[in-house]
Structures are given as C-alpha cells and as structure tokens.
Amino acid sequence: MTAAIIDYGSGNLHSAAKALECAARGMEGLQRIVVTRDPDVVFRADRVVLPGVGAFADCRRGLDALDGMVQALTEVVRDKARPFLGICVGMQLMATRGKEHVTTDGLGWIAGDVERISPRDESLKIPHMGWNTLDPAREHPVLEGLPLGPKGRHAYFVHSYHLNAANETDVLARADYGGPVTAIVGKDTAIGTQFHPEKSQRFGLALIANFLRWKP
C-alpha cells in the first residue's frame, strides 16, 4: 500500500510525512509513504493526503498549477473511492468554495463555504491558535477509539476560517472557540481535519493510524 502526500507548495510536508511514517510503524501492508508533485503517482496511490497552510485562494492556485493534479484527485477520490485525508486548508479545499478575501471555488466534495470564524467572546483572538478538545457529531471509523469530548485529548489548531458545511451529516466533530468550529468533516471515502494531526501528538498519530487502516 502506498500513501501519497501532495506537494503543491503549501503545507507542512516534512511534518506530515514524519507523522504518517510514525503512525504506520509496524503496520502490516503499508509499503511506502511518498511526497509527490506527480499526478500519476497520486493516481496510482492507495491513499492520498492533502496538507495545506495559508490562504484558500493561494492553495487552490498552487494545486491548479500542477498540471493534471485536480483531475487525478477527482478520479482517485470520487471515481475510484480511495481514502483521502485533507489537513487544515487541505480540508477546506474539499468545500464548495472559499470566502477568504475573495471567493474561490473548492473541489466541491463537501457542500458548504469556508468562512471566517466569529467567536461570540470578543476577547478571543483570531487566528485561533492553540489546543482544543473535540466534540463528536457522529461516528466514523477514523474516529474509532479516539478520546473525544470535554475530557478527551486536545488537537492543535491554527486558523482563521472554517468549513461551514451545508449538511449536518458531513460534520464528524466540532471544537468550541466562542462558538462551534468545524473540526472534522467526512463524506464517502474523504475525511478532513481543520486541526493539524501531525502536530497533535498522540491524539493526532492515533487519528492518522486509523486513517491508514481505514477500509471504506
């Protein structure tokens, strides 16, 4: 089994690769983890990871700049139904559109817009940076066994925008930052986290391990 991490000029590639390698250690059947800019490698991969850091429009532009990459992603995830993990802006790109400074089309896998978070408590700063527990919205194999809820482990967030999903069933978990913030979305064989699992210590590694074992 091969897991491909897409390098499109945005994302903590080294951290993501190291986290996947650590989570996969001793896992039967996982042959290799590759960082790639080649859509053919993505097309042949058994699982795909799309990290992302920065502005939505910049990340979409970087993805579009890799000739054939969006098509490969669409075929692998939507047509071939292989597992996909989007991280931070990689998760936001799953949405219908992003509204960060300008309106930009997303991949359209999760109905909804990426909008600026607006905490009810004006003392809470944006960007939201720090550790939060997650409140589960529905069950999912990638969340199995993870310590969620107010007494669960914390995940690490750095963001100013989140995916406001149109369908409640696409939201797997939320965080509280002066109001609900979408933390995890999932639909069919695609899942996305607004937080950084590669920076979320044992909790993040457990989620990544579940993703690598997931057989939708």
Swiss-Prot record:
Record domain Glutamine amidotransferase type-1: where: 2-216
Catalytic activity: 5-[(5-phospho-1-deoxy-D-ribulos-1-ylimino)methylamino]-1-(5-phospho-beta-D-ribosyl)imidazole-4-carboxamide + L-glutamine = D-erythro-1-(imidazol-4-yl)glycerol 3-phosphate + 5-amino-1-(5-phospho-beta-D-ribosyl)imidazole-4-carboxamide + L-glutamate + H(+); L-glutamine + H2O = L-glutamate + NH4(+)
Assembly description: Heterodimer of HisH and HisF.
Compartments, as annotated in UniProt: Cytoplasm
Record-linked HAMAP family: HisH (MF_00278)
Gene it is expressed from: hisH1
GO annotation terms (biological process): L-histidine biosynthetic process
Pathway: Amino-acid biosynthesis; L-histidine biosynthesis; L-histidine from 5-phospho-alpha-D-ribose 1-diphosphate: step 5/9
Function: IGPS catalyzes the conversion of PRFAR and glutamine to IGP, AICAR and glutamate. The HisH subunit provides the glutamine amidotransferase activity that produces the ammonia necessary to HisF for the synthesis of IGP and AICAR.
Alphabetical list of NCBIfam families matching this protein: IMP_synth_hisH
InterPro entries registered for this protein in UniProt: Class_I_gatase-like (IPR029062), GATASE (IPR017926), Imidazole-glycPsynth_HisH (IPR010139)
List of catalytic residues: 88 (nucleophile), 196, 198
PANTHER family: IMIDAZOLE GLYCEROL PHOSPHATE SYNTHASE SUBUNIT HISH
GO CC list: cytoplasm
UniProt-listed Enzyme Commission number(s): 4.3.2.10, 3.5.1.2
Keyword Amino-acid biosynthesis: yes
Keyword Amino-acid biosynthesis: yes
Name of the protein in its database record: Imidazole glycerol phosphate synthase subunit HisH 1
Keywords of this entry: Amino-acid biosynthesis, Cytoplasm, Glutamine amidotransferase, Histidine biosynthesis, Hydrolase, Lyase
Molecular function as annotated in GO: glutaminase activity; imidazoleglycerol-phosphate synthase activity; lyase activity
Disulfide topology: none
